[in-house]
Amino acid sequence: GINDGPALRAADVGVAMGGAGTDVAREVADIVLAGDNLEGIIEAIRLGRATYANIRKVLRYLVSTNASETLVMLGAAIVGGPEPLTPMQLLWLNLASDPLPALALGLEAPEPDVLDEPPHDPRAPILAPADFRRILREGVVLGASALAGYFLAGGATGAVQARTIVFHGLTLSQIVHGLSCRSETHGIEQTLFRRPNPTLFTAVALSAALQLGVQIFPLTRRLFGLAPLSLRQSLGIAGMVAASTVGNRVIGYLVHDGPGPRPLVVR
């Protein structure tokens, strides 16, 4: 009624009925329900929270992968080694490999318990300091795995071969890391098959196929300054991907009291 006007104005989000509500209520409300059906509000909250969570997932993925690239380049420079990645390879990492999984993470479906979470403080930053600590930790694990493979390969195969190994190892590790960023509270083994995301799976497969194509064709190998890989070296790349993925999962388990990785919480 008319007396609802002050309450609607004082509320964080005022909701009025489009048909049954008064003119005063509709004028001061933030949301007017055209069909007078409150069920639409529940669905809107669910989708709104999912959008907020997906933005955080995309930021988590992009910041952690870029942190890993920074660590790889700085780590090699500090010890006085040759560049582990060429400018062309870095450009490929940022323009051809990272965007597809990031875009697909933005389309992740709402998590089953999204409505059980308390509302977020609208004044809080989208990423809190605790979030950055987790993101940087994940980037360090990705970068350290690539650096370890680079230095181990460099002593036995030479700079070009080692650069090829770290290029593929880091790129594929970042692509797979997109699967680990699907949930803030559950690990990759809990979300990989229980909550399918065809868009993300397609993006990961396409990114991996593009990466494989760069290595297969002689023209792209020359363009990116890559060397042919033996079976043993290919298995080493697979080991780098597994080490970074499992490493992040294990560390996420150890720093959290529950069964899943440490959740990203906005306080």
Residue ranges and their predicted role:
Residues L172-S173, H177-R267:
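C-terminal transmembrane module of polytopic membrane proteins
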Residues G1, I41, A53, L264-R267:
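C-terminal cap/substrate-recognition subdomain and adjoining C-terminal extension
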Residues G18-I188:
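Membrane-embedded transport module
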Residues A11-D12, L59, A238:
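A general structural motif at alpha-helix termini
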Residues G1-A11:
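Acidic, divalent-metal-coordinating active-site segment for phosphoryl/phosphodiester hydrolysis
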Residues P6, L100-A102, L219:
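Hydrophobic residues in alpha-helical membrane-spanning segments
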